[in-house]
From Swiss-Prot:
SUPFAM superfamilies: EF-Tu/eEF-1alpha/eIF2-gamma C-terminal domain, P-loop containing nucleoside triphosphate hydrolases, Translation proteins
Region (G5): 194-196
Binding of GTP, residues: 14-21, 91-95, 153-156
Entry-linked InterPro entries: EFTu-like_2 (IPR004161), G_TR_CS (IPR031157), GTP-eEF1A_C (IPR054696), P-loop_NTPase (IPR027417), T_Tr_GTP-bd_dom (IPR000795), TRAFAC_GTPase_members (IPR050100), Transl_B-barrel_sf (IPR009000), Transl_elong_EF1A/Init_IF2_C (IPR009001)
Protein name per Swiss-Prot or TrEMBL: Elongation factor 1-alpha
Biased composition regions of type Polar residues, renumbered to the chain: 446-455
Cellular compartments annotated: Cytoplasm
Gene that specifies this protein: eef-1A.1
5-glutamyl glycerylphosphorylethanolamine: residues bearing it: 301, 374
Function: This protein promotes the GTP-dependent binding of aminoacyl-tRNA to the A-site of ribosomes during protein biosynthesis.
Domain tr-type G, residue spans: 5-242
Length: 463
């Protein structure tokens, strides 16, 4: 079979009626992990319910309903295959926790597909001041999704249908606003499609003979093509950060009879392997890793993206918990954050945020209240330029630099050093009121920590 294809994660964004579900459903349906039997079952149900037109959104509705009812779905349903990649759709907005998921990084998206509806009046609604198109694109950029594809959908419902003028108008408009946010339009494929009828999705449409194809210019290499599928194949595969020091935020800590304490989490950067001496922050507990397992098989080492359980000696379940971060004691070990500075974008807060505001922050797997100790500056969210020093307050739509102080021990990192540990969501009133990216962290010196016997024993063995 040769080498396995590279795995790519994408997130599909856009206004609620842009046709995200139909477009995504179409890809999964045509290239994906849904077997014929399931599709036939869906089709039959769709017809019985009078949704006889059975288009692809139905696939997605079914999957979503099952996911929300907590039925574990075969994750293959969210995957599809292209000539070059295995692509997983990690989430599509509309899911209430979409923003939180994107930030806490259940998975980091390698590319965002922005779906815009080209129908008369529809595009304008999505892009207007309060439309979601801008907000989603801004979010993707803020959270470090560096690549973007724009799918100009519903080309079959332009006036006249499949209008080149409308496609050009929308391409120009979207180019303008993604440029302001920080994407380079020259590196973004714009593809005119119909997610419903399949035009330019997998095959070139005969309805748009005027479309000569998309072309992008990038330092990693130029690319061109005609379909959305080819645009997905032009994604630049991510460099997984194995060469960075280890950071592994814990999702859970189990006590397993006969084995002992088993922390579980996803390697974000670096590698973890048996025999390594690791430090858990913010608790500052140091111990030796006895074994590393994934899917009940022991591994010689685990790399970024792997969800692993690992066994540690002489550490009780009381010592470490969800939100703790495991790191290599010898390579820039993780430490507790005393205070940190972050750039935040206030998204939907009904009032004003001023010094002293103490909401809950969701950062990697940690969930801890932090105090907005001081609003340092207000910045223009489009240009990033400072507009005011020490503002009295920040309100919805504002961006600013703030100093935060955790109310309980917390380990975070700057976004430039360890991206997955440097993004957070601010939660209040059961919603995401702001998102942030950490600029700098003042760490505690971490002098008083617990070092287990096995760590002391393991230490001299190392060179």
């Amino acid at each position: 079979m040769g080498k396995e294809k590279v795995h790519i994660n994408i997130v599909v964004i856009g206004h609620v009626d842009s046709g995200k579900s139909t477009t995504t459903g179409h890809l999964i349906y045509k290239c994906g992990g849904i077997d014929k039997r399931t599709i036939e079952k869906f089709e039959k149900e769709a017809q019985e319910m009078g949704k006889g037109s059975f288009k692809y959104a139905w696939v997605l509705d079914k999957l979503k309903a099952e996911r929300e009812r907590g039925i574990t779905i075969d994750i293959a349903l969210w995957k599809f295959e292209t000539a070059k990649y295995y692509i997983t759709i990690i989430d599509a907005p509309g899911h209430r926790d979409f923003i939180k998921n994107m930030i806490t990084g259940t998975s980091q998206a390698d590319c965002a597909v922005l779906v815009v509806a080209c129908g008369t009046g529809e595009f304008e609604a999505g892009i207007s001041k309060n439309g979601q198109t801008r907000e989603h694109a801004l979010l993707a950029q803020t959270l470090g999704v560096k690549q973007l594809i724009v799918a100009c959908n519903k080309m079959d419902s332009t006036e006249p249908p499949f209008s080149e003028a409308r496609f050009t108008e929308i391409t120009n408009e979207v180019s303008g606003f993604i440029k302001k946010i920080g994407y380079n339009p020259k590196a973004v494929p714009f593809v005119p499609i119909s997610g419903f009828n399949g035009d330019n999705m997998l095959e070139v449409s005969s309805n748009m003979p005027w479309f000569k194809g998309w072309a992008v210019e990038r330092k990693e290499g130029n690319a061109s093509g005609k379909t959305l599928l080819e645009a997905l194949d032009s994604i630049i595969p991510p460099q997984r950060p194995t060469d960075r020091p280890l950071r592994l935020p814990l999702q859970d800590v189990y006590k397993i009879g006969g084995i002992g304490t088993v922390p579980v989490g996803r390697v974000e950067t670096g590698i973890i392997k048996p025999g390594m001496v690791v430090t858990f922050a913010p608790q500052n507990v140091t111990t030796e890793v006895k074994s590393v397992e994934m899917h009940h098989e022991s591994l010689p080492e685990a790399v970024p993206g792997d969800n692993v359980g690992f066994n540690v000696k002489n550490v009780s379940v009381k010592d470490i918990r969800r939100g703790s971060v495991c790191s290599d004691s010898k390579q820039d070990p993780a430490k507790e954050a005393r205070t940190f500075h972050a750039q935040v974008i206030i998204m939907n807060h009904p009032g004003q945020i001023s010094n002293g505001y103490t909401p809950v922050l969701d950062c990697h797997t940690a969930h801890i209240a932090c105090k907005f100790n001081e609003l340092k500056e207000k910045v223009d969210r489009r240009t990033g330029k400072k507009v005011e020093d020490f503002p009295k307050f920040l309100k919805s739509g504002d961006a600013g630099i703030v100093e935060l102080i955790p109310t309980k021990p917390l380990c975070v990192e700057s976004f430039t050093d360890y991206a997955p540990l440097g993004r957070f969501a601010v939660r209040d009133m059961r919603q995401t009121v702001a998102v942030g990216v950490i600029k700098s962290v003042e760490k505690s010196d971490g002098s008083s920590g617990k070092v287990t016997k096995s760590a002391q024993k393991a230490a001299p063995k190392k060179k």
